[in-house]
């Protein structure tokens, strides 16, 4: 990759900017910002401020295509892929592409065979949490 990176002196993880590195360093120091409403902790003040909108209901970022509103610009950018058809996450195994990283990561389990969700009653394992929930109804 041609992009310059900076690495964490503590663990070696690489980042594309010093700003991201500085946020990451808080993992090692334990410095966090906590929500006064629910106690959830964040590594950056901006992530806390975005989270606080879930309590206030504020959604200042709106989609110019459909008018749907969001708590952060990052979520809006991801949402816009619905309208553009952009699918930036491609599977190296089968070529299938995805709009959302989370869906792509779930898809990868098909190829790895990973089944991280197990039934506490019978031990049967599932690839997806939703499949475990459906299965749990039989017990």
Curated annotation (Swiss-Prot):
Zinc finger (C2H2-type): 6-28, 33-55, 61-83, 89-111, 117-139
Gene Ontology MF: a single term: zinc ion binding
Keyword terms: DNA-binding, Metal-binding, Nucleus, Repeat, Transcription, Transcription regulation, Zinc, Zinc-finger
Native source species: Xenopus laevis (African clawed frog)
Subcellular location per the Swiss-Prot or TrEMBL entry: Nucleus
Protein name: Gastrula zinc finger protein XlCGF67.1
Family from the record: Belongs to the krueppel C2H2-type zinc-finger protein family.
Major location category of this protein: nucleus
Reported function: May be involved in transcriptional regulation.
UniProt key word Ubl conjugation: no
């Amino acid at each position: 990759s041609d992009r310059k990176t900076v690495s964490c002196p503590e663990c070696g993880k690489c980042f594309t900017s010093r700003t991201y590195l500085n946020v990451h360093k808080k993992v090692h120091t334990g410095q966090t910002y906590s929500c006064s409403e629910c106690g959830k902790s964040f590594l950056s003040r901006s992530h806390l401020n975005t989270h606080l909108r879930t309590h206030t209901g504020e959604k200042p970022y709106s989609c110019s295509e459909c008018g749907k509103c969001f708590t952060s610009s990052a979520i809006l950018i991801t949402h816009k892929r619905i309208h553009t058809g952009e699918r930036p996450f491609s599977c190296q195994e089968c070529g299938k592409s995805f709009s959302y990283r989370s869906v792509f990561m779930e898809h990868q389990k098909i190829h790895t065979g990973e089944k991280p969700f197990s039934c506490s009653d019978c031990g049967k394992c599932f690839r997806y949490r939703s499949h475990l929930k459906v299965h749990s109804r039989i017990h």
